[in-house]
């Protein structure tokens, strides 16, 4: 498989028809491909997230990351935009879902799309990936250490959010969860609650918890990076999408 790709900043249609910035990459190939919506983490629409978009394209998927902070701070640095959004209480849920639905529609509208779209997120993006998989139309989802899915957030968190466990019955696609045994948000006790609920509901899912890994073990530019967990996690991600996004 060739890793030739096209990567660029584009404008896509988001919530209520708004035009928002996004970063897209796709393999240069004639064969139909699946798509992946990449949700950036709370620190914002940054270079690490764009590198992830390109990684999917290099492995045969079209991918797009919508800038969820575009309306709040267009043109600002990721850190500044994230600070503005946190100060405002976070991205409203309806707007978030509208932008993610727009990103999926963008992928499915591409000439080489096979009609399938997955979603992935890390940290806050992992939580949002689970939310989107419960309320929107996706073919596969990956939650990388998304917190406050099965438990409420601690008091004083600047962004308002509620547990998502009551939405689990609506999970519309297979879910892969990748977690660290040493993580505090979410701790293993929280992922065990979610595991039990998805099992009770008969959902298709797989969870993997890595010993010796905490939060953000995929982040190569942080002290939290754990190479063995990250390498195995990427292998599982591509296996998962190969199973559910390829035709």
Model region roles, listed by residue range:
Residues 1-247:
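N-terminal cap/leader regions of alpha/beta-hydrolase-fold enzymes
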């Amino acid at each position: 498989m060739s890793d030739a790709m096209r990567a660029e900043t584009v404008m896509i249609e988001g919530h209520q028809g708004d035009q928002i910035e996004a970063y897209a990459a796709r393999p240069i190939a004639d064969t139909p491909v699946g798509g992946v919506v990449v949700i950036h983490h709370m620190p914002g629409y940054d270079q690490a997230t764009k590198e992830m978009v390109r990684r999917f394209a290099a492995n045969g998927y079209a991918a797009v990351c919508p800038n969820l902070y575009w309306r709040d701070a267009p043109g600002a640095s990721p850190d500044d935009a994230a600070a503005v959004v946190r100060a405002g209480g976070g991205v409203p849920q309806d707007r978030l879902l509208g932008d993610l639905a727009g990103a999926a529609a963008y992928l499915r509208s591409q000439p080489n799309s096979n009609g399938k779209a997955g979603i992935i997120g890390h940290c806050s993006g992992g939580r949002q990936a689970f939310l989107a998989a419960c309320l929107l139309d996706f073919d596969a989802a990956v939650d990388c250490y998304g917190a406050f899915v099965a438990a409420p957030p601690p008091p004083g968190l600047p962004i308002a959010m509620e547990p998502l466990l009551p939405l689990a019955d609506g999970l519309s696609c297979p879910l892969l969860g990748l977690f660290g045994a040493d993580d505090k948000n979410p701790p293993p006790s929280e992922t065990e609650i979610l595991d039990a609920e998805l099992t009770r509901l008969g959902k298709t899912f797989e969870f993997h918890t890595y010993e010796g890994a905490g939060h953000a073990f995929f982040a190569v530019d942080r002290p939290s990076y754990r190479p063995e967990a990250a390498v195995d996690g990427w292998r599982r991600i591509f296996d998962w999408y190969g199973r559910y996004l390829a035709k």
